[in-house]
Amino acid sequence: MKLAVVSVVVILGVLVAWPVSAGRKDLPGAGGYGGDDDDDTKSLFPLDNLLSLNYYDRICPDFEKIVVTKVREWTKSDSSLGPALLRLIFHDCGVTGCDASVLLDYEGTERRSPASKTLRGFELIDDIKSEMEKSCPGKVSCADILTSASRAATVQLGGPYWPNVYGRRDSKHSYARDVEKVPSGRRDVTALLETFQSYGLNVLDLVVLSGAHTIGKASCGTIQSRLYNYNATSGSDPSIDAKYADYLQRRCRWASETVDLDPVTPAVFDNQYYINLQKHMGVLSTDQELVKDPRTAPLVKTFAEQSPQIFRQQFAVSMAKLVNVGVLTGEDRVGEIRKVCSKSNSRAY
């Protein structure tokens, strides 16, 4: 069964216990923003009971311990892997749902799409899967591993913890043509909202999950059109602060180079991203569009002015929604528990 937004009733008590309500009252508006008339927590808990917080308690009790240990080991030697894992889960969930289709690696898959060429973290997921197969063979899906690893990476970066439910199955198929569903760095807010709403997410989730750009880097190739000869003007995008545009031009002479998405606190999971947007220092055009659009600008302003903890709390809620988009469950014949994350079982040998 494909579920647009799946969860379990048992999580309700956990989420309600989060200190989110204190931050919610500071968010502008209600309808459409996740206020009293649009309670996100209610949409998280349909009565299907197909995923569970304790899914692996008996069949693989060390599941989360293995994930956290491996993420810590890998990010210790390469700190850029933390943001990379967050980006990887976004790209997985944003195509056909959180089904690990992005991990399949053969001709014609999402992973082989030109739009996926800068994705990273695959080797870490493979390492975790290899360890799982030693501890509890055939029990843990790659989709659940990626979901758990993205949270472990977020926490490792100083971000929030959120409760994950498990029991996802892995997709047997992956198609490069589907990658166009992932929001690109050049879409306007209307297009972004249409995409998010198709996932069962709302405008608050859009602004909050965009805040993941408080860490990580952007490929200069994705922003050079904003820096050089913008709209055939021979100059840069006028929506970028002039001094910041000059800085980016000096850092992005070659498409292969990278630049911090947050130039102020690039290694800290905080609300600086929103402060930067208020100062016209958004690296991606989609980031800066959030300040210009009246549907999103009030939220950007709120997260910029409130305590960073408000952003962290809401990020946890929005991530708990995102990682349950379009999952495959135990009743799905189209899903499986892969033996190797990069290959469907029919291709594993």
Curated annotation (Swiss-Prot):
Active site: 91
Known EC number: 1.11.1.7
Annotated keywords: Calcium, Disulfide bond, Glycoprotein, Heme, Hydrogen peroxide, Iron, Metal-binding, Oxidoreductase, Peroxidase, Secreted, Signal
Main location: secreted
Residues that coordinate or bind Ca(2+) 1: 92, 95, 97, 99, 101
InterPro entries listed in its UniProt record: Haem_peroxidase, Haem_peroxidase_sf, Peroxidase_pln, Peroxidases_AS, Peroxidases_heam-ligand_BS, Secretory_peroxidase
PANTHER family found in the cross-reference section: PEROXIDASE 6, PTHR31517
GO MF, one annotated term: lactoperoxidase activity
Statement: the UniProt record of this protein carries the keyword Plastid: no
One GO-annotated biological process of the protein: response to oxidative stress
Gene of this entry: PER7
Organism, as annotated: Arabidopsis thaliana (Mouse-ear cress)
Binding positions for heme b per the UniProt entry: 213
Function: Removal of H(2)O(2), oxidation of toxic reductants, biosynthesis and degradation of lignin, suberization, auxin catabolism, response to environmental stresses such as wounding, pathogen attack and oxidative stress. These functions might be dependent on each isozyme/isoform in each plant tissue.
Co-factor binding comment: Binds 1 heme b (iron(II)-protoporphyrin IX) group per subunit.
Note: There are 73 peroxidase genes in A.thaliana.
Keyword Secreted recorded: yes
Cofactors: heme b; Ca(2+)
Enzymatic class: oxidoreductase
Annotated site, Transition state stabilizer, chain positions: 87
Residues that coordinate or bind Ca(2+) 2: 214, 262, 265, 270
Short name of any one Pfam family annotated for the protein: peroxidase
Localization, UniProt: Secreted
Gene Ontology CC terms, in alphabetical order: extracellular region
Family statement drawn from the similarity comment of this UniProt entry: Belongs to the peroxidase family. Classical plant (class III) peroxidase subfamily.
Name of the molecule in the record: Peroxidase 7
